[in-house]
Design a protein with these regions (language model features):
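C-type cytochrome heme-c attachment and multiheme electron-transfer modules
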Residues: 1-153
Length: 153
């Protein structure tokens, strides 16, 4: 339906695990560990900041890598010196592809659905500048459609 405007995964992927705030360190006994501040199940549709002939889409699926400033300080203080210089929400191709999904069962499951699209409110304060190119502003959301039927398969 959307051809080169929307990546196939936006309509055909199911939710994937999103991790936030990964920390690496050692416990009191010196045993290495990592932990995340939180995890959620879902995904967001965001803008494609760098279209290519192979990925010409305006919109694609984004996932949140768990890295934050300080993640690797256990190994080397300030190991991520350039955090915030590129988007932290990355394009992904989840292994949850299905022909029929919640979002492709009706047009308005995506059109006009703010929750499905990456919003500035989804970002941590230190991610806002880096993700400006992938956030979908309100005026970029696909409008709710008067008809809500998909063409027959």
């Amino acid at each position: 339906i959307h051809r080169r405007k929307v990546a196939c995964q936006a309509c055909h992927a199911q939710a994937v695990k999103q991790c936030y705030g990964c920390h690496v360190g050692t416990d009191a006994k010196g045993i290495a560990y990592f932990k995340c501040q939180k995890t959620t199940l879902g995904f967001k549709i965001g803008r494609n900041p760098s279209p290519t002939p192979d990925r010409p889409y305006t919109y694609d699926v984004k996932r949140h890598p768990p890295v934050i400033p300080g993640t690797f300080d256990f190994y080397s203080p300030a190991a991520i010196k350039q955090f915030g210089q590129s988007p932290t929400w990355k394009a992904c191709a989840p292994h949850t592809i299905q022909r029929h999904t919640t979002q492709n069962s009706a047009c308005n499951n995506c059109h006009g659905n703010r929750d499905l699209f990456l919003d500035i409110s989804d970002l941590a304060d230190d991610e806002v500048a880096a993700n400006a190119a992938v956030v979908v502003a309100d005026d970029q959301l696909p409008s709710t459609l008067a008809h809500d039927a998909l063409p027959p398969n």
